[in-house]
């Protein structure tokens, strides 16, 4: 029985799980000889929810349906329905291909690597991170900007397979069924349209090195990193069944697409629309493989990623939803931070819309929302721990626009009236 007797606290009840008193939590629920607080109940629900998601892959002979995968992505990623469908179908087919290969059928199913293209802050990396939470196959994320050709300072492409091995606890058979996400792949584009006469060790050279592992080869992977321990034995990993997903912002690609589309309208009746009048996501929908070649990807590299998925710009409504709806929503995070100071944080709807508009103006997408909120709340978070009696902080649209200070509402004490500062 979580009850303390003696002194002033003889009637105080405590949670049997976390030990917090009834005064530290919103609700304390009594059971036979035990108590549980609302915070522990929420934690238990989160644990059960995560276990349900991780057991997603147990349905239908171990193959989750595209709708099930897309449903989990919807919990964390706002919008981008087309990209979610592409990823869901690709992962579903990846599972089916693995099961098909295990049955030694006469038809060989080839994998379809994916290239995700979209403006910065639209959710490419978050989609990959969310996939990693729910999949029952080894998953790793790599950064293309750190890769160089073998023999130069930087990471070899084999290090990607090493990370996959580590996520599979060095089980080679499991690693050979995994999924690899390579981020910032646009940063390894060729530095000019023409083949370089000098060594491009972090651009075209990396693309050449990635070709074989993406298509399928037996890679020799040093378990401790090849350059530091040259005498170690190598592990042999077959990359034929590893699914590769590449993502990048490809800044400037919309201009290449726009130049190609300029010749479409001729004559008095032609509709002419400048690239500036269209949003980046809309322009990217007209993407053709030849545009990627002009951007600096080599033909062989583009050919190994047959599935192209473009992501859209996030509009004001999408950014507003990102601020408030997901489990890791920024507004919820800051509300919890203020709760730790026993202060309620309130945003007006107009304030949240002003934050969304500011992110659109900066062209930083969802990634820029946190920096905007930080700048708005910086002075308040600095002053709050030393202020007494503050019950609520209200953020209005004027505060976001820099025309006013946050409103502080004080608790009434012995007849005093609350004031705003």
Curated annotation (Swiss-Prot):
Sites where the protein binds Zn(2+): 15, 18, 37, 40
Domain of life: Bacteria
Keyword Chaperone: yes
Database matches in Pfam families: AAA_2 (PF07724), ClpB_D2-small (PF10431), zf-C4_ClpX (PF06689)
Positions annotated to bind ATP: 119-126
Signal peptide: none
Single Gene Ontology BP annotation: cell division
SMART domains for the chain: AAA (SM00382), ClpB_D2-small (SM01086), zf-C4_ClpX (SM00994)
Family: Belongs to the ClpX chaperone family.
Subunit composition and interactions: Component of the ClpX-ClpP complex. Forms a hexameric ring that, in the presence of ATP, binds to fourteen ClpP subunits assembled into a disk-like structure with a central cavity, resembling the structure of eukaryotic proteasomes.
Biological function: ATP-dependent specificity component of the Clp protease. It directs the protease to specific substrates. Can perform chaperone functions in the absence of ClpP.
Protein name: ATP-dependent Clp protease ATP-binding subunit ClpX
Organism (species): Parvibaculum lavamentivorans (strain DS-1 / DSM 13023 / NCIMB 13966)
